[in-house]
């Protein structure tokens, strides 16, 4: 819009005007119309020109006017554009409203059409329904007329015609009934007794209308739902109804025949037999075990549920399925109608520790179950004695329904075991809880005797010929173990009687030298007291001349009553005439005391062997019936004094408790849960088999208190996972919603960490208490070191989050309690589990008094739990006291012995020596041992390597080191590694590492990982700077470098020291090459 200006002030469109001479200026007016003089393309009125003489003064105002004019033009254009824009918007709105009205009209029209179509369809359906009703009514009328016609024909029939003709259905039913009867009769004739198939005699008692005490159908396992011989419904007892023309005599004969058949069944008692025979060979009655009606009630007594088991025999069996578990499962199922996907732990790498494990199909599960049943009997054969009165938890059932729902089998098998018991047999140990016998045996198939596999054909003595044998492995285990235990007891009773007879001969012939008594570790205290009275009376008859009745009997006591000094004083105070008899009696008492002490020691060994097999035995908690002190004869029985607690040996301590075995998923399938009870049971059996357990001191564990748990975990977390279900109901409902239904059918907090409503809280607290007890005994000097065989693990458990099989962090709680109660200033925690201990790191991340060092697979955060990066060094005052030896590089190649030994040599041990701890705690997970699948580890360490790592750590803190079991799921691997660690703790000579490992250099990924860790922590620990050049060396090369360095230092020291100080030193202390004085 702007025009180019000339120097004279005119625009480019204007032509220059010729100046007039001064003579003509005087004759011109002041203003002139120059319209005619302008060019044609310039409008005269558009640009008026001022031709006054004083134009030179108005020329500077021309650009300002032009600018103002341009501004006005711009404003006009803007207003025009604004008006056009408003017009467009109004047009758009008008068209939009028009289109909206059209669309709405079309929508209404469509809805109207749809409604009309629905109305027509509904009307057609109504008409069709009416036609169907009419047709059905017509058919009913026709059928009614047909029946009336038949009835009329029957009324008007002739006398010679038959009154009724059997239909085709009746004939088929009759034929099937006759065939079943013939098959059952032929089967009985072939076997001469009832079939051994449980389905037969369950079905045989189910249909009976005469036997009202048959077990309810709900108690039968799902495996019994197949059609069986001789089984038919109650309505089919008499397939042909009696007609008016049939005589009653025929019906009575049928009833008598049925009663005779039922009397021949071995499941019912025969009342016509003699009483002695019935007591001696009493067949198994279902009503005694599967029903809880009164013992003397008749057939009309109502049955109770199958879960209520009669305690008539003095035993209350353990019911596997508890109401608490049922209620939790019911809450999980009924919450929001269905179970949503699991709200699992979310991490940057892996959400769950078992992600990627192959799923086990039903066929594999069935095969594993058969192998488990095959391997269970050899495991039970090895020195496992089952006491009468105990109840086996059915871990060997063929299906979860048979284990949980089949409550009729458990009392049935228990009653069967009681029937095998002789009348004089009494329960030796009472109060034993459920015994979980794991299916996987530590003993391989090559160690199993061939005769053990024949136990399924074993028929116990005393059983009637018609009584069927149980068909599952659990009942066979009951019977076999029962008989073995009874044979042991009979054998040792005879030996005990011979031993007591020998003692009596010693009393009657004091001049004969005493012989060493035989040892029988299987005897119990009850047997000692049982034979005590029998031995006292003959001894009173043999020594009638003694004056003091208190010395008349030799008592075999549980513990000594008097010390030897007191006995010597009593001898000195006796009269001279009684001194020989008193000395003789003292000799006898000493012999009996020695014998009893030896027997108590053997009883403890027997108790340990039973605990190793998974059977808790406590002799001290049971006291047999004894004579009251107020009775006249009580003076001859001295009072027994409880044994004072003995001080443990200063050696390696072990802690283990069978209650931790009960923490199992309610689905019962251990194949889908790597963290199962067989882990610690196999380790404990391995320690027993190798003899390492006998060299250690076994301590008693306990449950950790809630206050101890809250040293690391929050109060809500402690109450939720550490209390019973009743206390859990008092918590906020949002807290209890963390439990979810697992795909296997059980309950858990995620797909890995299962939850058992009854046993998980107790097992988790017991694991913490066992670790705490062992750590405190080692820290106070009662024990040298220790190994805790505990589960569930704990190093993944955070302050308020359970994960990775862990609920409570046992090692972290023990460290906190050491700080609070014993004022331990420096604690070293080494975690060599293949997974990072995120919970332990969180508990001490800002604590400079606890040095946490973890060796784990990291893979840049792509391995569970995703934490444990090398740059996580701590915070606040704890900076530098959190060392993560994070291996990166995946499994190409996997880490092995050379890499872990190099990490210990260059990172772990130098920092630990510089830290100088007072106590060393080890989160001892063995899932880095070879044999674990990739999701659970994938590394190839050997079990021997962990023995050498343990031996290196024993050089710290004066040897005060405690290992607590964490991860590890391959049974062979964890058993070998545990054996190696316990051997190292005991100070045994370890097997040498292979030469290949000694000369093998760590792989490139491991070297890179160690260099990264050393670079980060070199500013906190000065010892790392000296060892950085030897990271890539093998063990042999590193030892050579250290020897050369030591020789160089020695040579430099000898050159810098003068002769006189050397001579003076030789006089004061020996040199290195001299032998120490």
Swiss-Prot record:
GO cellular component terms, semicolon-separated: A band; actomyosin; chromatin; cytoplasm; cytosol; histone deacetylase complex; neuromuscular junction; nucleus
Polar residues bias spans: 205-224, 627-639
Motif Nuclear export signal, residue numbers: 1044-1077
Chain positions of cross-link Glycyl lysine isopeptide (Lys-Gly) (interchain with G-Cter in SUMO): 557
Chain segments carrying region Interaction with MEF2A: 117-312
Record GO biological process: cell population proliferation; cellular response to mechanical stimulus; cellular response to parathyroid hormone stimulus; cellular response to tumor necrosis factor; chromatin remodeling; epigenetic regulation of gene expression; negative regulation of cell population proliferation; negative regulation of DNA-templated transcription
Amino acid composition bias (Basic and acidic residues), ranges on this chain: 132-162, 258-273, 515-530
Residue positions, PTM Phosphoserine: 209, 245, 349, 466, 563, 630-631
EC number in record: 3.5.1.98
Extent of motif PxLPxI/L motif: 348-353
UniProt xrefs under InterPro entries: HDAC4/5/7/9 (IPR046949), His_deacetylse (IPR000286), His_deacetylse_dom (IPR023801), His_deacetylse_dom_sf (IPR037138), Hist_deacetylase_Gln_rich_N (IPR024643), Ureohydrolase_dom_sf (IPR023696)
Reactions accelerated catalytically: N(6)-acetyl-L-lysyl-[histone] + H2O = L-lysyl-[histone] + acetate
Any single Pfam family the record assigns to this protein: HDAC4_Gln
Binding-site residues, Zn(2+): 665, 667, 673, 744
Region named Disordered: 132-167, 204-225, 239-327, 508-530, 542-582, 623-646, 1052-1077
Key words, A-Z: Chromatin regulator, Coiled coil, Cytoplasm, Hydrolase, Isopeptide bond, Metal-binding, Nucleus, Phosphoprotein, Repressor, Transcription, Transcription regulation, Ubl conjugation, Zinc
Span list, region Histone deacetylase: 653-1077
Coiled-coil residue spans: 66-169
Comment text on domains: The nuclear export sequence mediates the shuttling between the nucleus and the cytoplasm.
UniProt record similarity statement: Belongs to the histone deacetylase family. HD type 2 subfamily.
The name this protein goes by in its record: Histone deacetylase 4
Gene that encodes the chain: Hdac4
């Amino acid at each position: 819009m702007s025009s180019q200006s000339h120097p004279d002030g005119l625009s480019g469109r204007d032509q220059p005007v010729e100046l007039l001479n001064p003579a003509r200026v005087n004759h011109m007016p002041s203003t002139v119309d120059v319209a005619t003089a302008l060019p044609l393309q310039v409008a005269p009125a558009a640009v008026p020109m001022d031709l006054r003489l004083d134009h030179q003064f108005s020329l500077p105002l021309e650009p300002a006017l032009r600018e103002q004019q341009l501004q006005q033009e711009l404003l006009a254009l803007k207003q025009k554009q604004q008006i056009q824009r408003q017009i467009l918007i109004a047009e758009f709105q008008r068209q939009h409203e028009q289109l909206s009205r059209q669309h709405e009209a079309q929508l209404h029209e469509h809805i109207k059409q749809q409604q009309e179509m629905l109305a027509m369809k509904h009307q057609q359906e109504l008409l069709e329904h009416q036609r169907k009703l009419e047709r059905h009514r017509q058919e009913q009328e026709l059928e009614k007329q047909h029946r009336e016609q038949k009835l009329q024909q029957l009324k008007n029939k002739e006398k010679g015609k038959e009154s009724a003709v059997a239909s085709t259905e009746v004939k088929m039913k009759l034929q099937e009934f006759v065939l079943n009867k013939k098959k059952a009769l032929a089967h009985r004739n072939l076997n001469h007794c009832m079939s051994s198939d449980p389905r037969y005699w369950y079905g045989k008692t189910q249909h009976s209308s005469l036997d009202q005490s048959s077990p309810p159908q709900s108690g039968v396992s799902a495996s019994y739902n197949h059609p069986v011989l001789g089984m038919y419904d109650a309505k089919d007892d008499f397939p042909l109804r009696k007609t008016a023309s049939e005589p009653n005599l025929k019906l009575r004969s049928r009833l008598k025949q049925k009663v005779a058949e039922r009397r021949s069944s071995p499941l019912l008692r025969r009342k016509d037999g003699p009483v002695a025979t019935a007591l001696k060979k009493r067949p198994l009655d279902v009503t005694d075990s599967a029903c809880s009606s009164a013992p003397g009630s008749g057939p009309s007594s109502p049955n109770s549920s199958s879960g209520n088991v009669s305690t008539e025999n003095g035993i209350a069996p353990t019911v596997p399925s508890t109401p608490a578990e049922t209620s939790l499962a019911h809450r999980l199922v009924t919450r929001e109608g269905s179970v949503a996907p699991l709200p699992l732990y979310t991490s940057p790498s892996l959400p769950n520790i078992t992600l990627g494990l192959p799923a086990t199909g039903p066929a594999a599960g069935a095969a594993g179950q058969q192998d488990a049943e095959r391997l269970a009997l050899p495991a039970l054969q090895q020195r496992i004695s089952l006491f009468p009165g105990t109840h086996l938890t059915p871990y060997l059932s063929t299906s979860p329904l048979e284990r949980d729902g089949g409550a009729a089998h458990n009392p049935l098998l228990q009653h069967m075991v009681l029937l095998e018991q002789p009348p004089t047999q009494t329960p030796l140990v009472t109060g034993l809880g459920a015994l979980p016998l794991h299916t996987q045996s530590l003993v391989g198939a090559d160690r199993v005797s061939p005769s053990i596999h024949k136990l399924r054909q074993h028929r116990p003595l005393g059983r009637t010929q018609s009584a069927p044998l149980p068909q599952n492995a659990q009942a066979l285990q009951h019977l076999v173990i029962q008989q073995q235990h009874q044979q042991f007891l009979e054998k040792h009773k005879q030996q005990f009687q011979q031993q007591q007879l020998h003692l009596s001969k010693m009393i009657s012939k004091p001049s004969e030298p005493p012989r060493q008594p035989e040892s029988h570790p299987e005897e119990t205290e009850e047997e000692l007291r049982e034979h005590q009275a029998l031995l006292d009376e003959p001894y009173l008859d043999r020594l009638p001349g003694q004056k003091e009745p208190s010395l008349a009997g030799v008592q075999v006591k549980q513990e000594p009553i008097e010390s030897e000094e007191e006995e010597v004083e009593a001898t000195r105070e006796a009269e001279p005439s009684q001194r020989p008899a008193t000395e003789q009696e003292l000799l006898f008492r000493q012999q009996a005391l020695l014998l009893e002490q030896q027997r108590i020691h053997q009883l403890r060994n027997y108790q340990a062997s039973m605990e190793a097999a998974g059977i808790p035995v406590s002799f001290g908690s049971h006291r047999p019936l004894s004579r009251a002190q107020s009775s006249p004869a009580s003076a001859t029985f001295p009072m027994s004094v409880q044994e004072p607690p003995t001080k443990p040996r200063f050696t390696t301590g072990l802690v283990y408790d069978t209650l931790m075995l009960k923490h199992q998923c309610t689905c019962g399938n251990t194949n889908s849960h790597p963290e199962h009870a067989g882990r610690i049971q196999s380790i404990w059996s391995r320690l027993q088999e190798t003899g390492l357990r006998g060299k250690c001191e076994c301590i008693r564990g306990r449950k950790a208190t809630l206050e101890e748990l809250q040293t690391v975990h929050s109060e809500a977390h402690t109450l939720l996972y550490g209390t019973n279900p009743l206390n859990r109901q008092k918590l906020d409902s949002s807290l209890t919603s963390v439990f979810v239904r697992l795909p296997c059918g059980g309950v858990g907090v995620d797909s890995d960490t299962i939850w058992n409503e009854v046993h998980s809280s107790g097992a988790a607290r017991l694991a913490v208490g066992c670790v705490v007890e062992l750590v405190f005994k080692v820290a106070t000097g009662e024990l040298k070191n220790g190994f805790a065989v505990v589960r569930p693990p704990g190093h993944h458990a955070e302050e308020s989050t359970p994960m990775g099989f862990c609920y409570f962090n046992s090692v972290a709680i023990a460290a906190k309690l050491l700080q609070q109660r014993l004022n331990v200033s420096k604690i070293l925690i080494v975690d060599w589990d293949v997974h990072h201990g995120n919970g332990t790191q969180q508990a001490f991340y800002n604590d400079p008094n606890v040095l946490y060092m973890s060796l784990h697979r990291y893979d840049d955060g792509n391995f569970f739990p995703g934490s444990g990066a090398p740059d996580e060094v701590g915070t606040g005052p704890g900076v530098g006291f959190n060392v993560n030896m994070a291996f990166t590089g995946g499994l190409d190649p996997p880490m092995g012995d050379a890499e872990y030994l190099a990490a210990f040599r260059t990172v772990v041990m130098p920092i630990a020596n510089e830290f100088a701890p007072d106590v060393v705690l080890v989160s001892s997970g063995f899932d880095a041992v070879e044999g674990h699948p990739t999701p659970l580890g994938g590394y190839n360490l050997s079990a021997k390597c962990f023995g050498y790592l343990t031996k290196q750590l024993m050089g710290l803190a004066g040897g005060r080191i405690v290992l607590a079991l964490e991860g590890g799921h391959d049974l062979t691997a964890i058993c070998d590694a545990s054996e190696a660690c316990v051997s190292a703790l005991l100070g045994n000579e370890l097997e040498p590492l292979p030469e290949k490992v000694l000369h093998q250099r760590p792989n490139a990924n491991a070297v890179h990982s160690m260099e990264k860790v050393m670079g980060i922590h070199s500013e906190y620990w000065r010892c790392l700077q000296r060892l950085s050049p030897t990271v890539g060396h093998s063990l042999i090369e590193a030892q050579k470098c250290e020897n050369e360095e030591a020789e160089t230092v020695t040579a430099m020291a000898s050159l810098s020291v003068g002769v006189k100080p050397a001579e003076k030193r030789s006089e004061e202390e020996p040199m290195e090459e001299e032998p120490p004085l």
